[in-house]
Amino acid sequence: MSADGGGIQDTQDKETPPEVPDRGHPHQEMPSKLGEAVPSGDTQESLHIKMEPEEPHSEGASQEDGAQGAWGWAPLSHGSKEKALFLPGGALPSPRIPVLSREGRTRDRQMAAALLTAWSQMPVTFEDVALYLSREEWGRLDHTQQNFYRDVLQKKNGLSLGFPFSRPFWAPQAHGKGEASGSSRQAGDEKEWRGACTGAVEVGQRVQTSSVAALGNVKPFRTRAGRVQWGVPQCAQEAACGRSSGPAKDSGQPAEPDRTPDAAPPDPSPTEPQEYRVPEKPNEEEKGAPESGEEGLAPDSEVGRKSYRCEQCGKGFSWHSHLVTHRRTHTGEKPYACTDCGKRFGRSSHLIQHQIIHTGEKPYTCPACRKSFSHHSTLIQHQRIHTGEKPYVCDRCAKRFTRRSDLVTHQGTHTGAKPHKCPICAKCFTQSSALVTHQRTHTGVKPYPCPECGKCFSQRSNLIAHNRTHTGEKPYHCLDCGKSFSHSSHLTAHQRTHRGVRPYACPLCGKSFSRRSNLHRHEKIHTTGPKALAMLMLGAAAAGALATPPPAPT
């Protein structure tokens, strides 16, 4: 048997047809047989596939037809500008490619399995040609062979192409991309591809390389289960024809919307990588995020756009759920309530963080001092004590702070603003926490009890300072004399004795003191006791002397 343009002309091969390996061991003999049958010299003999038409043979040649009728050799030049595309899914080595017959010849299952095994062991790439199997040929393969065929294609091409004879049921819409240089060329290309899209390429038909490049039109999409998959056109012919594969309908047939090459966007260079951005899935709090399309993938024009704007402040958001959460800052709505203390929050994440306070869990530990914290942000702020980092700077006096809240409190000293007002006594404060602490003086609430003596305090800092009376801890040390104190205020007052500072003066006699408590003790002298009575008498005498008019001169 011979073929035009470099057919196999080895008489030895005619006498000894290639053996079919055992079905249970398909990987043993087929590659060696293919290696013996494929010559390596004729690499530039033909530019397209052309097989010898079937001819009548004598009875003596029936055995030869049995061996060569199942499959034949199709020469293809290596490095030519034209490639033969049979089916998307499998790539075959060049220069000579085994092609399954389309002439209705008898197909053997074992031969198909052996052929697939040979393809899996050949160094192929997707730049070579692919092979189509007709629906009838695919049906002759058993379930194991079909799975093996898919595995081979996935390993070689890196893509899940599904069945080789029809569009995959999950294939997305692949917009047809391609431009024709002239009306005559466009008509010729359309004629060629129209025949190719029906299933198989006819023997001797030429296939343009520019259409093969349409295999690069891979589009990402998101399934209903939230998984991102990649789809490709079932064949490059469909992309060139402007046809696309849609998602499967209830009937099991893929949708085929009508598209024309004129309405398709221009095809980018096949050598340039194309990037696709899939929007991240929002968390549970952000359910109801807008999705575009049946599969939930936002179009390129919607990616990065903030189309949801607040009517009050004009702030933009990419998701509607984010806008709903933001509106609560204007309305004051707090739908998430703590079941332990009744405190309410505008976000569910804030409630979860708050509930750690009641459980007492402190999973975040400082590696330097082994101190534990209930929140990761608190640990980060604590670690700045060890590193000395102060990232927050006042824009007026350049003073630096480790916490943002401390900076906000400090900035109130420059502006004098006290936005938090007590509704009972109208006293104003720079921080809301200071207002909450102040309101306990009106309500008498003391939520911090001492576990040792049961004494209660309105502020947590007072409880911490009180606990030192039980433990005897004195963490504040004077740098001048080394004396230690349990309260920082005691250390501050003690340091004035070294510096001679006396900021507290008596308004009656002008005497100064270094501590406020000493001033209060001194003021009692002017109001009570024998000294106070003597002062009152002296004051009255002095006042009477001033009030008595002088005697008239004689």
From Swiss-Prot:
Gene Ontology MF term list: DNA-binding transcription factor activity, RNA polymerase II-specific; DNA-binding transcription repressor activity, RNA polymerase II-specific; RNA polymerase II cis-regulatory region sequence-specific DNA binding; zinc ion binding
Annotated Basic and acidic residues bias: 11-30, 45-58, 274-289
Transmembrane segments: none
Tissue spec: Expressed in heart, skeletal muscle, pancreas and brain. Weakly expressed in placenta, lung, liver, kidney and thymus.
Residue positions, PTM Phosphoserine: 292
All copies of domain KRAB, residue ranges: 124-193
Zinc finger (C2H2-type): 308-330, 336-358, 364-386, 392-414, 420-442, 448-470, 476-498, 504-526
Listed GO biological process terms: negative regulation of transcription by RNA polymerase II; positive regulation of hydrogen peroxide biosynthetic process; positive regulation of mitochondrial outer membrane permeabilization involved in apoptotic signaling pathway; regulation of DNA-templated transcription; regulation of transcription by RNA polymerase II
Function: Transcriptional repressor involved in regulating MPV17L expression. By regulating MPV17L expression, contributes to the regulation of genes involved in H(2)O(2) metabolism and the mitochondrial apoptotic cascade.
Domain notes: The KRAB domain is required for transcriptional repression.
Listed name of the protein: Transcriptional repressor RHIT
Species for this entry: Homo sapiens
Gene that produces this protein: ZNF205
